[in-house]
């Protein structure tokens, strides 16, 4: 009988030791997982994601335009005609262009190469074009041909543009002109989020420097590669060729052809219409 009691006591002692060891292990685990002063906290409420309104609908339609004297014209309200130029146009006679109806010009001041190096370069004719257009009494804006793939590059382009237009008295915006080149270009895999951020970075920097900024794009780019609702603080310049004006959103400038003929400008000319804001009927 005593031996049985001794055995029972021994088993009880072993059980107590095992339970104590288990409790010790559990305590250690709690301390490791939740160190003192680092108790679990309820998740902090997050701010709702910003929402953006869609761009304003386009108040212009196909019925507002017709050909007049060889050029597309808005026949239902005021408008003005202009061109955009780069060094590839060679020597320009601005007086002849003005007499043909051109009232404004956007001058390319520089660009970034679409090869992998992505080098920045100035337009060799920009200063000459600026002085000639100003002397002829035309309104002048500027544009930069971008191939940025990051916000850092877009800011580099903005600062480069500001250096190139230093001393210019611009009447019109400084334009961010990012274009898809081809499948082998450094920009071929840029996503909409990346390009929208690049566009905002460039335009914000231009605006912060005291200039008006504007965004240039074509129909497919505006649909697939830009979140236009995030860019509505800046005016839009749309490239839509050989087509009636049926774009859904309001644009301030419409580049309606790449193959125009303008006296004083050698070769093909990009022709644009400036369309004033007006109420939707």
Indicate residue ranges for each PLM-predicted region.
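Functionally critical loop-and-helix segments that line ligand-binding/catalytic clefts
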Residues: 49-87, 231-281
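Substrate-binding cleft of extracellular glycoside hydrolase catalytic domains
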Residues: 75-201, 207-209
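Aromatic-lined carbohydrate-recognition surfaces of secreted/lumenal glycan-active proteins
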Residues: 206-224
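Structural recognition of alpha->loop->beta junctions
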Residues: 162-176, 180, 226-250
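Short, low-complexity, disordered segments immediately C-terminal to signal peptides
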Residues: 39-51
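Hydrophobic anchor at the start of a short beta-strand
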Residues: 140, 212-214, 236
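N-terminal Sec-pathway targeting helices
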Residues: 3-23, 31-32
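Hydrophobic single-pass membrane-insertion segments
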Residues: 29-42
């Amino acid at each position: 009988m005593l031996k049985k009691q001794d055995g029972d006591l021994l088993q009880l002692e072993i059980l107590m030791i095992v339970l104590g060891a288990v409790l010790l292990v559990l305590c250690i685990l709690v301390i490791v997982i939740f160190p003192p002063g680092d108790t679990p906290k309820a998740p902090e409420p997050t701010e709702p994601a910003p929402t953006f309104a869609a761009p304003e609908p386009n108040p212009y339609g196909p019925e507002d335009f017709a050909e007049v004297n060889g050029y597309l014209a808005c026949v239902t309200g005021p408008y003005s005609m202009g061109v955009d130029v780069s060094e590839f146009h060679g020597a320009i006679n601005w007086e002849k262009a003005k007499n043909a109806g051109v009232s404004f010009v956007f001058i390319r001041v520089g660009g970034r190469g679409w090869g992998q190096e992505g080098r920045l370069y100035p337009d060799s004719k920009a200063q000459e074009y600026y002085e000639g257009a100003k002397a002829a009494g035309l309104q002048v804006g500027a544009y930069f041909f971008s191939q940025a793939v990051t916000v850092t590059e877009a800011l580099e382009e903005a600062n480069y543009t500001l250096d190139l237009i230093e001393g210019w008295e611009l009447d019109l915006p400084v334009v961010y002109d990012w274009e898809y080149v081809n499948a082998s270009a450094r920009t071929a895999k840029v996503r909409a989020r990346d390009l929208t951020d690049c566009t905002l970075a460039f335009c914000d920097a231009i605006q912060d420097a005291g200039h008006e900024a504007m965004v240039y794009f074509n129909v497919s780019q505006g649909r697939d590669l830009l979140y236009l609702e995030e860019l509505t603080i800046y005016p839009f310049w749309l490239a839509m060729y050989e087509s009636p004006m049926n774009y859904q959103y309001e644009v301030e400038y419409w580049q309606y052809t790449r193959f125009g003929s303008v006296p004083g400008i050698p070769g093909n000319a990009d022709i644009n219409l400036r369309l004033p804001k007006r109420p939707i009927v």
